[in-house]
Amino acid sequence: FSALIISSFFAIIIGYFLALKKFYLKNIIIIMFNSLMGIPPVVVGLIVYFLLARGGPLGVLQLLYTPSAMIIAQSIIIFPIVVSLSYEIFSQQWLQFRDHFRAFNIPLFGTMLTLIRHSFVVLITILLTGFGRAISEVGAVMIVGGNIEHYTRVMTTAITLETRMGNLEYAMALGIVLILL
């Protein structure tokens, strides 16, 4: 949930500015975010692992195998999804209401608040999409978190572990709880 809050705050703002502003390379940035929506989580985990490993550029922070590393990996996974989907909704809303905003000379921040309020339900759906991607993620979380009991073990990694150990009933029970979330 922390990863969703952190990444969505910045992603919605970036999606908003991509929708409203015209600038050089805008289309390339949009294509990049759309492509990153499908990045394999294991690749994200591997990149974060290399960054946070002892010999990596951020190794001095000693974040590997901590919940913070898991939040970083999940934030990176969620970020392009929320940027791309919020860009789409804001660009549609902007085309619909652009003349009204310009006629009343509403500033950028006021425009953002109005568009967020107008598309609130869709934004909640976007956030739930990001949350679903984060909560169902196994690979990146296992790589950077280490699946340490009572510290970095989450439901998806626990399901994987219990299945490998042959505790299929317990793994299925965890899976049902995960679906109900």
Describe the residue ranges of each PLM region.
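Juxtamembrane helix-boundary/capping and inter-helix hinge elements in multi-pass membrane proteins
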Residues: 21-26, 91-96, 106-108, 147-151, ...
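Short cytoplasmic-facing helical segments at TM-TM junctions of multi-pass membrane proteins
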Residues: 85-123
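Interhelical loop and adjacent transmembrane-helix boundary motif
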Residues: 142-180
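Interfacial helix-capping/hinge residues at the ends of transmembrane alpha-helices
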Residues: 14-15, 45, 98, 141, ...
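Membrane-water interface segments at the C-terminal ends of transmembrane alpha-helices
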Residues: 1-91, 118-138, 171-181
